[in-house]
Amino acid sequence: AAGNAQVDNFGRGGLGGDAMRAEALDYSGTNNANMSTPADGAPPRMQMYRFVNRGVYASAPGVTFTYPPAGAQFGPLAFDLTAEVVVAEPTDGCVALTNSASLSGKIALIDRGTCEFSAKVLNAQQAGAVGVVIVNNVASAPAAMAAGMFGSSVAIPAIMVAQADRPALTAGGVVLRMQGSNA
């Protein structure tokens, strides 16, 4: 199969007449996209769903955030949570956390790293955390976090903040308010 998805292949092989059908802002779903790729000669179809731009906010006394926080595409969409921030151990959150006694009822601060976001948040949830702040690992704006393999198992909210915000959040005794809205 040539997989060229166009009406005229200009003599370069494959069957013609299979122009791609791209459906932008398809309202049959949200926060996703898919593509069907039939055999050569039949038109492929791409559906790009509407992405929900939820509002995510964070505030803490004495903390000025570099960028607005970003939300997660998993866990609760609407939340309003206030708790003390505690650094997770290990800080990348990729394995079971070892400081569950300190995290119980708190917001876990986890560094962005090599494993998927939902694995980090699930590990914090299993350690007793009520929310998660993931700190970006590059000096740029936080990015929305995809659900990954464990997204459907996560029941606590998560946000991402800028790398520059880490020192203020790890100063000790910081009480953070995290808010999310699905509107």
Where are these regions (language model features)?
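Extracellular zinc-dependent metalloprotease catalytic-domain scaffold
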Residues: 1-55, 181-183
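Structured lumen-facing ectodomains of secretory-pathway proteins
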Residues: 49-183
